[in-house]
Amino acid sequence: MRHVAIVGAGIFGLQLAIELNDLGFEVDVFEEKGVILSGSTSKSLLRIHKGLHYPRHLPTAKQSLRNYDSFVERFTEAVNANFNNFYLLMEKGSKISLKEMSEFLGALKSDAEIIELKQLAQLGINPLGVSLVVSNKEGVVDLDLLRELFARELSCRQIRINLNSKVREVTQNASEWRLLGQDHELGTFDVLVLATYGNRPIISGLSSVQPELMEYHRTLTLEVKLNIEKIGVTVIDGDFLTVLPKGFSDSYLIYGPTPSRLEVDIGTKVPERWLTSEWEDKNSVLINRASLTLMNRVKELFPESNPVISGNPLIGIRSVGVNLQTTDARESNVTELFHNLFEIHSGKIDHCLEVSRYLGRLIDRH
């Protein structure tokens, strides 16, 4: 039986572990934190959508659309889809025109509906400057319920989840991969998969792997209370705002491209300073300023909502390809860096089933 190591216990890493175990592989998952789903997965909006968020990149939109139903079916108990989502196109500041948006909707072939602008006021949304409103039934993932679901499924499988296990280095020994921790060896494996959302310093010493230039974002998402009907709103496509329910709770999560990107760095690995516990304290002024900007945007979008921050700031890290500003492409895919060494590029959580099935078959054929 071949032995696979997966580094990263986010939704992509865990779903792949289940896929491989069901195919007959021995699987170890290594997670540096003490709880599964506590990295990038936990610091995002946890949106699952049907592609409307990506009108400038049809392939990303179609990948989300074709995976939506299977994701909801797979994770039903952790998905809240009991609210309406609204996508607003602005007359000014958008990166696409009304004509381009209409063409995109036709090409995507989703079940989205264009609604009348006058309905915005009934929802408590400021209609000023809005040129188009599209309604779509979508959902969000409840993180606590997703953790419970995975914990239950992992407990009845022969999968070892190694928490508080930071992989410091990877070395190659013939056809095997040797994983090293802080002061001890973690094991030797036939196949290695990186599901670390672009954080790959552990393989920087491998001469067989070429470093890849990525754009890394230090991100801010806020949890807030809003006095509004339970809905989701995304203003597209530019530097606007997204407001979505937080799972099944009575809170909302908000994100805006420019204020939520606290720092941007282009390189071959995540900046070391972001990985220290002191980063948030040292950048408290930056975080507070960005939070204020986000709250002001919420007040502009929902004038009567009385927004109040209700949780600690969610500070995360995301990685995207370089020079993607024109299209905002976020496709998820797999790269084979070397024989039996794979890296998952995770664009959106709703792509995890497609990616894990593809990679499972690929490893099974090797």
Please place each PLM-identified region on the residue numbering.
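N-terminal Rossmann-like FAD-binding beta1-loop-alpha1 element of flavoenzymes
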Residues: 2-28
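Central helical "cap/lid" subdomain
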Residues: 37, 185-237, 246-250
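Dinucleotide-binding Rossmann-like beta1-alpha1 core, especially the glycine-rich loop
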Residues: 45-123, 129
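Helical element adjacent to the flavin cofactor pocket in flavoenzyme catalytic cores
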Residues: 134-183, 187, 191, 195-200, ...
